[in-house]
């Protein structure tokens, strides 16, 4: 995913935290903030030290999240800035569980623009 698709600055992160709405499941929390006049969505990913004590574990989970979001890119609403925050429960997730849990929370947060992903899971 290109840098233009990322929420990069601390200021942008804080704006989404403070003004956005949150939705969560056991593995992830998603904060969303609608942004009009935006060509494409922007996402920020946060995996703290409570999730994985080593950088290897945290980076692995971030890779899984980015891969899932890249796969879902056509279905993600373009008018959003959103943050994906991993919870400690997600520590031992493999790619399949990461994808399943992330799709679930993105649906709850209404980040996905259609329901085509439902058929993919089954």
From Swiss-Prot:
EC number(s) per entry: 3.1.26.5
Alphabetic keyword roster: Endonuclease, Hydrolase, Nuclease, RNA-binding, tRNA processing
Pfam families hit by this protein: Ribonuclease_P (PF00825)
Transmembrane helix recorded as keyword: no
Recorded GO CC terms: ribonuclease P complex
Reactions listed under catalytic activity: Endonucleolytic cleavage of RNA, removing 5'-extranucleotides from tRNA precursor
GO annotation terms (biological process): tRNA 5'-leader removal
GO MF term set: 3'-tRNA processing endoribonuclease activity; ribonuclease P activity; tRNA binding
InterPro entries membership: Ribosomal_Su5_D2-typ_SF, Ribsml_uS5_D2-typ_fold_subgr, RNase_P
Role according to the record: RNaseP catalyzes the removal of the 5'-leader sequence from pre-tRNA to produce the mature 5'-terminus. It can also cleave other RNA substrates such as 4.5S RNA. The protein component plays an auxiliary but essential role in vivo by binding to the 5'-leader sequence and broadening the substrate specificity of the ribozyme.
Family stated for the protein in its record: Belongs to the RnpA family.
Subunit structure: Consists of a catalytic RNA component (M1 or rnpB) and a protein subunit.
Protein's name in the database: Ribonuclease P protein component
Species of provenance: Lactobacillus gasseri (strain ATCC 33323 / DSM 20243 / BCRC 14619 / CIP 102991 / JCM 1131 / KCTC 3163 / NCIMB 11718 / NCTC 13722 / AM63)
Gene that produces this protein: rnpA
